Each structure stands twice: as C-alpha cells, then as structure tokens.
Amino acid sequence: IQYAAIKAYSEDHSEYLENSRLILKMIGDYIYKELSSVGVICQKPQGGFYMICDFSNVVNKTHEINNDKTLCQKILNDIGFAMLPGSDFGMEEDKLLSRIAFVDFDGSKALKMISKEKPSSDNFLDLTCPKIAKGISLLKDWIISK
C-alpha cells in the first residue's frame, strides 16, 4: 500500500483536477442559470458538486408543502427529481431550502470529452449530462406550473 501511495502522489494530477473542476463548474453554472431564470434563489457554486437553492419565491406554502421536507418529497413524487431538504444540513426546516447535487453523469466520458477539446457548455451538457439537463428541465416546468 505504501508503494501505491508513493506512485499516486508522485504523478502530476493537475490536468485531471483542472478538468474535473471545469466540468463541475459548467454543470453548476448551467443549473444556476436555469433555476434562477424561473425565480429560484440559488447560491452559485464556487466549487464542489452541489448548490443550495431557496424555493420560497416560487412555491407557496400549503397543507401539502409546508416545509423543506414536504417540498422535496412533493417534487420527488411529482417528477422524480431528488434533492435533499436544507434542514438535513442544519438549515431551518420551515424555509423552503434544498441542496441539489449534480453528480448523475458519466465522469469518465465527461473527462475524455473535456480533455480532447473545450466544448461549449450547452453541447457538453447535452452529450455528457443528459439526465441532469432533463431533471432541471422537469424541475423548471414543475415550478412554472405552480
């Protein structure tokens, strides 16, 4: 194991890390732009693979949706889009906050594509992240219908 660690730490991983960051930035920017366009207040991600979104401006509290947990459950039941309630991460439950992770894509395919050329984000997302694009589209349609 120690020899494996020496090998792993001796290689230059800078291109892999740069490309991984670029992929996640492109996905995060896309989700931010799309959800912001329908009034969801999102914290633009600075790195990582998730963002916090506030649905208070676009979803009215009702008997069916009265906190972040019921919001997430309703969206999951209605359109099959999974996100976690903000209260799972220490935020107030009565706020309509959620954490959306953007990890449902083929990372190997995305890395290969980004290494060959720096594609436009829309083309890249269509080719490597179709489930994310479809999920965000369904979520936007759900919000608009409310």
Predicted feature residues:
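PLP-dependent class I/II
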Residues: 1-146
